[in-house]
Amino acid sequence: MRVLIIVCIFGAATLGGCAESKDTTSSFDMSEYRKIMERQKHEQAAVESTESSAPKLSPEEEERAGDTEAQRRNFPMAGLHYTKAVNAEPTRNSARLKLGQLMLQQGLFDAAVTQFKDVLTRDPNSAVAHQGIAQAYLQQGKLQEAEAALTKAIALDPSSWVSQNLLGLVYDQQQRHSDAIAAYKAALAIRPREPNVLNNLGLAYALSGDHETAIQFFEQALAAGSNSPKLHNNLGVAYAHRERYVDALESFKKAMDEPRAYNNLGVALLRMGNARVALVCFEKAIELNPQYYEKASENLRQAQKTLSQSNGKTISQSTEAVSCP
C-alpha cells in the first residue's frame, strides 16, 4: 500500500478470463504467512533463549529493526519488532501506523483498523490513520465507511494522491464512475504519470462506456513505465470494444500465453454480442493447447448456445468475416 494501493477487482466474470481489474498492490499470501509465522515461532523461541544475555532493545530500536526487516520483505519479523515497540511504548504512533500498514498488506483488516483507531485516540488528525482505516474498509466492502474515512483523510492532507486514488476505487465500486474519474484526475494533478492511477482512470472510462478515452489512459500508463499484465488485459478489452481485434490480441498476449489470449479475445467478443467470431477464437485457443483448461471449452459451449439461439447469425453486424485474428 511502500504506501499501499489496495487491489480492487470489479465483479466476478461470468465467463472464464477477460475480467477487467484495477491495478493495485498484491496482498501477502495468508496461507504462506501462517506457515512462516509457525516456523518463526520455533526460531523465535531459540532467539529468546539467548535474550537474557543480549542487550534489550529500546522501542525506537525495535521500530528501526522492524523497518530493516520490512525492507527485506521479512514481514513476520517486521511485525514482531513493531509489536515489541508498541508493547513497550503503547503511545508510539509511528510504530503502530507501520504495524497497521503491515497488517493491511497481510489481509488482517480488522486488526489493522484496531491499530489505526488506537492512533486516532491520541492523534485524531492523523491522515495516515484515516487512510489506513479506509483501505481496510474498502477491502471488506464497507464502501460508505471507506468513503467517510477518505473524506477525512483528504481534508487533513489534500496532497495525498493515494487517498484520492482510493476514493476513486470506492466510487467505481459504487457505480459512481463520473465521481471516480474526478477523483483519479485529482490524484494525477498531485502525481502526474502515476501508472496505477492512469490505469484506474482508464478503467473508470471503460466502465462508463467510453472505451476510446479508456485506451488513451491505458496507453499513457504503458508509456509511464507500467508493464502490468492487468494493464495489458484492460487495454485488450478496450481495443476489442473498439473492434481493433488484432491490437486486442497482441495486448492480451503481453499479459498471458497465446491460448489464453485467444480465449480472452473470445470472451470479449461474446460479451459484445459477436458469438460467431468468439466461437472461432475459442476453437483457436483449444487448437493451440488441446489440454487448455476447461474455461475455453466452457466458453465455446456458451458461444455455440448463443449462436443456436440466434439461428446461427452473428448478433453483432460489425464483423462479417468469420475469423479470429
Regions inferred by a protein language model and the residue ranges of each:
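Structural marker of alpha-solenoid helical repeat scaffolds
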Residues: 88, 122, 156, 190, ...
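Canonical tetratricopeptide repeat
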Residues: 64, 98, 132, 165-166, ...
